[in-house]
């Protein structure tokens, strides 16, 4: 395994050694990263992902994937890649668990709506919210002075969770569209990034990122097939495939030719051809599962092989080494990701559903602003009262909305509408 250092295991707030059993002096012998993973696994923020949208909503269909089940799948894939590369499996696993932990209700649609209402405090970004939850908002470690350190994860754990390891605003004043830290949290990110000589994410974060792409593309295509939104026969319809490739290249980058090549290589796989005949029978469900299993194994195995071949004789870990994704795997994953996203987006009810979701977020934001601090939960109420500016107060309100499950947000939106109607 890669030789992680004491600096990698260091925490921002010192902690006493923990006893592992009652009435004994035995010390907890878990590694720092195993403890980190346990903290994420037991966090309320992770549990709330069970009631947050993945591609379809948590209440669509009998067995939909939610942000929580997606995160568990990402963690399992990341653990496998990490083990294959001799990285710490717990470190890669926890990165997968918390990669979406900052996402608000309604996925990227909710993220865009919150970014609008958060303009006065610098905007909203799901990746930056992840860091904020892990280092501030999730209640676990509090200093004697009352400062929250969130889960107080190790440096390497926080680094592995940072997909875009830079703050919103650069030194020259330019602004990044994607980032892992709000400007007010840049000091924390600087502490995390000690030892890095460039802006590359650590290889554990690269593992998490590609594991997310694998889970998103393979498993969400599975959901789309079962829901009737996706028909794999499009891979054999060259006219429709060309149109899909154009849309995918525009949405995710690359060229249409790359996506068409991905479709061509997928067509050659017997498991894909078998899954394309899905008809809701027992055999077709089994064929669909066979396809998802083979595709995940295909992308994990080929990436491990390519990375080890490129870095032969070198210990990869932390800031040393890059994940090498074969071109065939990359093009297939991008094509499947296009299927997962665009077929759902093209659903006739999708735009109307998104508008309703945005309206709920705007209504709840107005309700909390007008009623603050009394309208806020006790923990957020305290932070609101302690805020030094209106901008900081807005950030607290945005933090609370982002932490809500979709069910709670919808209840609060209904209550806010009832109160508004009563007041006229």
UniProtKB/Swiss-Prot annotation:
This protein's name: Deoxyguanosinetriphosphate triphosphohydrolase-like protein
Biased composition (Basic and acidic residues): 8-18
SMART domains registered for this protein in UniProt: HDc (SM00471)
Taxonomic lineage: Bacteria, Bacillati, Actinomycetota, Actinomycetes, Mycobacteriales
Coiled coil ranges: none
Family listed: Belongs to the dGTPase family. Type 2 subfamily.
GO biological process entries: dGTP catabolic process
Organism listed in the record: Corynebacterium glutamicum (strain R)
Single Gene Ontology MF annotation: dGTPase activity
Region (Disordered) residue spans: 1-24
NCBIfam families xref list: dGTP_triPase, PRK03007.1
